[in-house]
Amino acid sequence: MENIEKLLMQEKILMLELDLVRAKISLARANGSSQQGDLSLHRETPEKEEAVHSALATFTPSQVKAIPEQTAPGKESTNPLMANILPKDMNSVQTEIRPVKPSDFLRPHQGIPIPPKPEPSSSVAPLRDESGIQHPHTNYYVVYNGPHAGIYDDWGCTKAATNGVPGVAHKKFATITEARAAADAYTTSQQTDRLNFIPKGEAQLKPKSFAKALTSPPKQKAHWLMLGTKKPSSDPAPKEISFAPEITMDDFLYLYDLVRKFDGEGDDTMFTTDNEKISLFNFRKNANPQMVREAYAAGLIKTIYPSNNLQEIKYLPKKVKDAVKRFRTNCIKNTEKDIFLKIRSTIPVWTIQGLLHKPRQVIEIGVSKKVVPTESKAMESKIQIEDLTELAVKTGEQFIQSLLRLNDKKKIFVNMVEHDTLVYSKNIKDTVSEDQRAIETFQQRVISGNLLGFHCPAICHFIVKIVEKEGGSYKCHHCDKGKAIVEDASADSGPKDGPPPTRSIVEKEDVPTTSSKQVD
C-alpha cells in the first residue's frame, strides 16, 4: 500500500512539472521572445522545488497519515485507543486540476502557494553550524625552576616569574593534564618537590620588583640617597610641584659632601667638575630627575645634557623648562639635536630661622656636540657650617663675573628672565634692544651688596674692583655710611660678618649707583 501511495505522489509531481513546462512554452509562443523562453527555462530548477512543495500540500488526508502521539516508549505504531483522524482535522484540498494561465507568472511564486514553514520547537537542536564560534581557551604554563616555580594559568604571572631572571625554564601547554605531566616528569628527574598549581588570583609576585630584585646588586647604604620629598609614583603636573620644599642646610651639606667624594664609579649618568673649594655636578642623559632638582636647588650644577624628551629636567621650575622647550622648537632647525644647559649659580644662605636666600642662576642653552666627560676625582671634604658664608661669597663673585660677561656678547637672545633667573642662548643676529634692556635690568637688580640676601662688604668690594677695571664707578650707601668699607682684598672681612641671625633685621636689596660704563 505504501508503494502505491509513493507512486501516486510521484505521478502528481510529474504532472505538475509537465503542466509547468507547457505553460512556459505557451507563454514563449505568445510573446514571441526567445529570451524570455531561455529565462524561464533557466529558472526551472527552483520552480521544481516549489512544485514539489505544492504537490505535498495537495495530498488528501487519506494519502498522508501522521503518526499519532505515543503513550508508551517503544517502536512507533498506531495507537488503537486514539482515532487516526477526525473530520475537523481534514483540510480542504483542490481535487481537480486547474489549468495554468499566463497571468499566473506575474504573481508571486507564479501563483503556486507555498506552505508555511513550521516553527522549530525548543527541544529541536539548532540547524545552524556552530563550528565557527570560538570558545575561550586557557593555556597553562609550567615554570620548571626558579624562586617562583609552579604551574600558572595566566601569562602575566608567568612573565613576572621568568622575565629578566637568568636560567629559568618555562613552557606552554594546551591542557592542565599535559602541564601536570610535564611538571611531574621534571620534578621526578630532578628529585625535587612537586610543583603546585598557582591560579591567577593567588600569584603573589610583581613583574617589576621580582626580576629587578634578583638581577640587581644589593644597594649600597645611602650612596645615592634622595633628599627632600619622596619621588612621586607618576610624573606630576607642574602645578603639583610648584611648591617644592625648601632645601635645608643639612640637605646642602649632604649634597656638597656627595659631589666632593664622587669618583665616577657606579654611575655613568653624571661626572663632576672639581675645584679647590667646591665640586659641581654635570648630568648626562638618563640622570635621575629628582637628583637634578635637588642639585639645582642647592646651586651645585655646572652643566645638564638632557635627553630629547627632557625627562632629566622635568622637576625644574616650570618657566625654565618651558624656555628650554621653546628653544628646541623655535631656535634650532633640527629638533632632534642634543642640547646643553650651562648654569652659573650662587648657593643658598640660611639663618637661624631657616632659608634666607635661594640661589640665583644665569643659564645658557645651546646645541651640544659630543660630550667628553672629565675625570671625576674624589676630593677632600672638610666643610663646616661656619665655612658656608665664605663659600657663598666665592660663588657670588663667580656669578657676577658670568653675568657681566654678557656685555661682551653682541648676539644674544633672551629666552626667559625672572627675578632671580636669566635664561639666554646665542643668536645669529645682533641682540635686539628689548633683550638688551632685559639684561641691563637684571644686572642692576642683582649686582649689589645684597646679592646673597644680606649686605655683604666682600661682595661690594669685589664689585668696586670689577667696575673700576672697566673705568666706571660703584657706590653703596651702606658702605658710604661707614657700616663696612673694604680697602683691599687682604682686608676683606666680608665672610666673617656673615648673614644676620634673624630675618627681621635683613635690609632690602639696594639698587647700586654705577656709571654707564658698567653695563655697556
Curated annotation (Swiss-Prot):
Keyword Cytoplasm appears in the UniProt entry: no
Instruction: State where it is primarily located.
Output: host cell
Question: Where are the residues of the annotated region Disordered?
Answer: 103-126, 487-520
Tree of life domain: Viruses
Entry annotated with the keyword Electron transport = no
**A Pfam family that the UniProt record links to this protein:** Cauli_VI
The UniProt transmembrane annotation reads none
Query: Which family does this protein fall into?
Result: Belongs to the caulimoviridae viroplasmin family.
| UniProt protein name | Transactivator/viroplasmin protein
